[in-house]
Structure formats: C-alpha cells, structure tokens
Amino acid sequence: MEMKIFKDKHTLLKEILKTKGTSFVPTMGGLHKGHLSLVKQSKKSKFRTLVSIFVNPKQFNKKSDFKSYPRNIKKDIKLLKKLKIDYLYIPTLKDIYGFKPKNKVFLDKSSKKLCGKFRKGHFEGVLNVVNRFIEIIKPRYIFLGKKDYQQLYLIKKHIEKRKIKSKIIECKTIRESNGVACSSRNLNLSKSQMKIASNIFHYLKNLKKKIKKNYSLFKINKIKKELIKLG
C-alpha cells in the first residue's frame, strides 16, 4: 500500500473509518532518527500507521522561535515514503484550531516546574494540540519518545484524567554518536554549542555512575560544579 497524504481532516476520517484503527506518531516535521524510530515501532503494531506534521504555534514562547523551527516537508515526505507508512496528515491551522474540543486540557501542577518554569505556556500549548489531534483521529496507540520526559508525563496525566481510550507507547531516546539526543533543533546549534551539549550528556552520565557507586557528596558536588560551568 502506497502512503496516502491528507491535508484535510474530513477526507482523513473517511479513510480511518475503513480501518480497525491507527497508531499515531505526532511530529512537527524536521524528521530525524528519533522520529523514524517512533515510526518503526508504530509499524510493528496491528493498526495503520499515521504520522502528522504540524508546527504548532501555540507551544512557542517567541514568534522568532516558531519562524526559525526547521522545516523541510519534501525531505520528510521522502523519508516517510521510504518507511512505507500508511497515512501522512499535514493539517492546516483551521483543521486543528477551528473547532471546540470536547475535553478540556488537564494541566498537572508539575507543568510549572523544571522546563515549565522557564517556558511559560509551552506545555499548555503542547497538550492543547495533542488533545485536538486525539479528538480528530481517535488513535488506538500514540507513540511518544522519552526525550521530552516532562511532556510525556503531562500527556499521560491528561489522558488518564480525561479517561481517553488512546494508549501511550513510550519509546527510548535516540542519540547522535556524540551522545546528544536527536532533535530537530540540533540543526540550529553551532559546532561549539553541540560540543557543550555533548559534554553535558557525558557529565550527567558520569554523575549517575558516581551516585550509584555511593560516591561522597563532596565528589558529587565537584562534578555538579563542573557541569554548571559548561552552561
């Protein structure tokens, strides 16, 4: 079966109704090894694989971040065709935000901690779009990576609280050869910034080993100070 591309939710829904259900992989495009790993996991399920590409404006704190987000739709389509997915959904803004969802977004209090402390409204924007995709597609499974762990936790909480039937499938973080987690935004990093990101990963990995080996608090704090210096 050749991959079908949909840009309108109504024609997509007609197609989905012919199936037993879908395994959904939501993305914002700029596909990399991490995304492709999710797609491969999805293809192992008994349902049709549906990938979405939608750069969600609601989850960006700055308009400049939204505009600079890496986009290469032709390359993304080529990669997905190669993996022989069933459906690709590239919705318009109206498709996603042109209706009132039945479920209100449940935002757990932990959304204001960690990453949420510095990215006001980000997680609300993520949950808003995920909630809308779920109402449109009603997927059996949703495949998400552990890379954005706080985001994953909040989506799971929303699904649990709203008693949504879609099941979350957690997939491992895929990394570059230097240890940095695969991310579309890595394209925006300079060589020196990429080196810093790689060093941070290796320091954290080292710190984890030391904690497991019951190293003294003094030695652990020394590593922490070195990590802070890296930025």
Residue positions per predicted region:
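Nucleotidyltransferase catalytic core that binds NTPs
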Residues: 2-230
